[in-house]
Amino acid sequence: MLIPKVKAKEFEKFGFKKCKGEYGKGGCYYLCVARGCKMLFVSSAIFDVNDWIDNDPRIHKDANCRYRDHRTYLDIIYELIKADMLGREGR
């Protein structure tokens, strides 16, 4: 399982946007990935990949999706690992 190695706010550098509502107040961030319709979710304690659904209460009405971006969610996760922002649980 992947976990964040930095504060969730640091993920803004990679295009993550603060969640709306209570999730945002809790310091959670998300990034929608057009290729594969995935949503990357991060807080100070967890990193998760979910299917991107329009009525998700964490996502803003105008999601921060870059449709011209040709990366998949796995490409982005790889870049986050290389940037030392994500690591394995227990290490």
Regions found by a protein language model. Give the residues of each.
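Amphipathic alpha-helical segments
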Residues: 2-20
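Absolute N-terminal positional cue centered near the fourth residue
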Residues: 3-4, 42, 49, 88
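Acidic, low-complexity, intrinsically disordered interaction modules
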Residues: 19-77
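Structured beta-rich ligand-binding regulatory domains in large eukaryotic signaling proteins
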Residues: 80-81
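Short acidic DE-rich linear segments
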Residues: 85-91
